[in-house]
């Protein structure tokens, strides 16, 4: 007489960030320093169930059916943590230097491979502000060289968790453990992207 199913999911995110900035000017020397820390947590909950043999097609609640078809629930958690530092310097708005470093951890990876270090640096020269630059048809001309790295853990969440995992099923009223057919990889770590 029909099947009725219900599901419910809930998610929350928490971000906890701190920054400490210091800026100072000495004549034409400008210095800007920053250190910071950030923690992020994502947690998901999911619950579902279905029953058959409905008492009425107008009653779409689980209480309106008598035979349990399936039930299920799970929860997942994902965390990242970052420590960072950055320094910026310029002289007379003509010569520029920048450097940053970040130490980043992710629960997507095995504890032995959880942390990665990423850095970036750049230098610039504003030629159009030099006294000898007299090309009036150029408003601004700047030379810049930079290199940077960043890490990516998306698409790899929980991949290593499948190592040594078992599924639980019902075998004639008894608990049966079945080895997971999905193999995890404890060696996975951050994907590092570099850009010049």
Predicted regions located by residue number:
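Extracellular/periplasmic, surface-exposed regions of secreted and cell-surface proteins
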Residues: 1-196
């Amino acid at each position: 007489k029909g099947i009725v199913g219900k599901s419910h999911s809930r998610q929350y995110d928490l971000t906890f960030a701190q920054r400490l900035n210091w800026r100072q000017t000495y004549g034409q020397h400008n210095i800007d320093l920053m250190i910071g820390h950030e923690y992020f947590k994502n947690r998901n909950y999911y619950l579902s169930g279905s029953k058959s043999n409905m008492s009425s097609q107008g009653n779409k609640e689980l209480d309106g059916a008598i035979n349990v078809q399936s039930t299920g629930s799970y929860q997942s958690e994902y965390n990242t943590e970052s420590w960072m530092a950055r320094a910026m310097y310029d002289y007379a708005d003509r010569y520029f230097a920048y450097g940053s470093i970040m130490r980043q951890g992710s629960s997507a990876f095995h504890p032995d491979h959880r942390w990665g270090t990423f850095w970036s640096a750049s230098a610039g020269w504003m030629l159009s502000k030099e006294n000898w630059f007299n090309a009036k048809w150029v408003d601004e001309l700047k030379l810049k060289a930079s290199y940077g790295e960043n890490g990516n853990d998306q698409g790899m969440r929980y991949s290593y968790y499948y190592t040594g995992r078992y599924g639980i099923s019902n075998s004639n009223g008894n608990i049966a453990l079945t080895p997971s057919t999905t193999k995890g990889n404890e060696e996975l770590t951050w994907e590092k992207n570099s850009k010049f």
